[in-house]
């Protein structure tokens, strides 16, 4: 396992442990994606989080906030000791991502399904501005039971948003149990292809 991924997971566990409650599984399962984006791919500047033309990550499964905070701290967006204030009075790190509180967060997480729609809108705006940014979004597999995900996927394909990359975190779990027992998703890759997306399946 990559050492940075290991550190993201360690800090995530410590972050959640500091408050004693949180979505630990859904946070740990996106460590590799976060590492690749923030350390290898995304054009961002921790010293200037609102930099024009930056790449953006919109975490639609906002309950994975602790992992996002861990990678942001590692990249220098804010001090690591902020991690131990998760969801406490006066914190800048609420349990779900909040763009008005946390440096480096580009969209506030709300009801499941909404974040990806926001990502589609941001990608459209980026095209209009011609700023050459890439917009990334992380979607939960349980979240994919929301119809709004598929409305957004359909629109993105219609608009030919080649500046938008979506990751579905297929960890097979949601708050009420296994995804396939709660509301089976079947072959998610086939569903995305049917909506006009180019799909790659990655282990890890």
State each model region's role:
Residues 5-21, 169-171:
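N-terminal capping segment at the start of a domain
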Residues 100-104, 171-173, 190-195:
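Gly-rich Lys/Arg/Thr-decorated short loops/hinges at beta-loop-alpha junctions or inter-strand turns
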Residues 158-184:
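A short, conserved beta-to-alpha structural element at the edge of catalytic cores
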């Amino acid at each position: 396992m990559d050492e940075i991924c290991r550190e993201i997971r360690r800090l995530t566990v410590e972050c959640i442990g500091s408050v004693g409650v949180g979505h630990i599984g859904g946070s740990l399962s996106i460590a590799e994606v976060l590492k690749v984006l923030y350390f290898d791919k995304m054009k961002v500047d921790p010293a200037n989080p609102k930099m024009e033309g930056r790449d953006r990550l919109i975490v639609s499964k906002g309950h994975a906030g602790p992992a996002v905070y861990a990678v942001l701290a590692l990249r220098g967006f804010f001090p690591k000791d902020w991690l131990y204030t998760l969801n406490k009075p006066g914190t800048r790190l609420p349990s779900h991502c909040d763009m008005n509180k946390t440096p480096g967060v580009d969209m506030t997480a709300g009801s499941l399904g909404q974040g990806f729609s926001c990502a589609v809108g941001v990608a459209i705006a980026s095209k209009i501005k011609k700023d050459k940014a890439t917009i990334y979004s992380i979607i939960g597999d349980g979240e994919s039971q929301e119809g709004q995900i598929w409305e957004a996927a359909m629109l993105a394909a219609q608009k030919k948003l080649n500046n938008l990359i979506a990751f579905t975190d297929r960890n097979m779990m949601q708050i009420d149990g296994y995804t396939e027992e709660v509301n089976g998703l079947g072959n998610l890759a086939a569903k995305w292809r049917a909506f006009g997306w180019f799909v790659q399946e990655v282990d890890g």
